[in-house]
């Protein structure tokens, strides 16, 4: 479980970025949304110790992040940065994915097994000898996820994962998230992509001006006035609202809802 207890944070004294944030998240898929500058990335970087609270505490499976290293926490919470290139430094895809497990001190045989599983999970089997920097944007995003998967964390934090991806790349990402959910992985996804939120999220955390504006069920979230927070409703939500239906995830659900 990830527990946030009365957390405050500032980069500059007197200008808090996060103000008394409290919440708990156990499993499933949590979307973290809000306007630019609302504190989203600052908050989720606390989940694996990249940033420490100024006040309050963040506990990950009972471990206070103030008392643990990022290396220790990375076994529980993996972080995929918005720009995957920032994560890469090896010359082959295999060595890139193997880097984390090797640092854990695993045998080379177990490292190979983890790399094989992670690459298959993200659809990059056969890419082992390719140069990470020569992959497409979507392939780089999948490789970044594979690098984290190979560490076998309980939670994966994805920071704006659809940025720069075309429709095909976004579709592949959604499939990966759904498949890994079935295998027991949980996700925290920072995003402006409301279609992604509608299709995959269980819960939504809405931040604005460093404060929690909403934390709860995804369908309840889409009943809010999102324009107030400079967020764009998915077309499907607009249609549901227009005909007096509660939000649904797919066109198929919409058709069933109107009896077709």
UniProtKB/Swiss-Prot annotation:
SMART domains: AAA (SM00382). Its EC number is 7.-.-.-. It is a peripheral membrane protein. Keywords: ATP-binding, Cell membrane, Membrane, Nucleotide-binding, Translocase, Transport. It is found in: Cell membrane. Pfam families: ABC_tran. One of its GO terms (cellular component) is ATP-binding cassette (ABC) transporter complex. It is an enzyme of class 7 (translocase). InterPro entries: AAA+_ATPase, ABC_transporter-like_ATP-bd, ABC_transporter-like_CS, ABC_transpr_CbiO/EcfA_su, ECF_ABC_transporter_ATP-bd, P-loop_NTPase. GO terms for molecular function: ATP binding; ATP hydrolysis activity; ATPase-coupled transmembrane transporter activity. Gene3D superfamilies: P-loop containing nucleotide triphosphate hydrolases. Probably part of an ABC transporter complex. Responsible for energy coupling to the transport system. Belongs to the ABC transporter superfamily. This is Putative ABC transporter ATP-binding protein PF0068. It comes from Pyrococcus furiosus (strain ATCC 43587 / DSM 3638 / JCM 8422 / Vc1).
């Amino acid at each position: 479980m990830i527990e946030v207890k009365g957390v405050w944070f500032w980069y500059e004294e007197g200008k808090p970025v996060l103000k008394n944030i409290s919440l708990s998240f156990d499993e499933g898929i949590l979307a973290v949304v809000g306007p630019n500058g609302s504190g989203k990335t600052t908050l989720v970087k606390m989940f694996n110790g990249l940033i420490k609270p100024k006040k309050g505490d963040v506990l990950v499976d009972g471990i206070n992040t103030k008392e643990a290293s990022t290396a220790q926490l990375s076994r529980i919470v993996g972080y995929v940065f918005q720009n995957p290139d920032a994560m890469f430094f090896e010359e082959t895809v295999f060595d890139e994915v193997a880097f984390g497990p090797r640092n854990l001190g695993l045998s080379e045989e177990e490292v190979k097994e983890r790399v094989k599983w992670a690459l298959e999970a993200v659809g990059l089997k056969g890419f082992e000898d390719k140069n990470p920097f020569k992959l497409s944007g979507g392939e780089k995003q999948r490789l970044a996820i594979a690098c984290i998967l190979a560490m076998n964390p309980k939670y994966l934090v994805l920071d704006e994962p659809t940025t720069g991806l075309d429709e095909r790349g976004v579709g592949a990402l959604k499939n990966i998230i759904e498949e890994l959910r079935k295998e027991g992985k949980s996700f925290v996804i920072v995003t402006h992509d409301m279609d992604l939120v509608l299709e995959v999220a269980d819960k939504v955390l809405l931040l604005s001006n460093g404060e929690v504006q909403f934390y709860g069920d995804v369908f309840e979230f889409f009943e809010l006035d999102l324009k107030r927070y400079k967020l764009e409703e998915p077309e499907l939500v607009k249609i549901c609202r227009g005909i007096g239906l509660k939000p649904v995830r797919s066109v198929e659900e919409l058709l069933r809802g109107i009896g077709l």
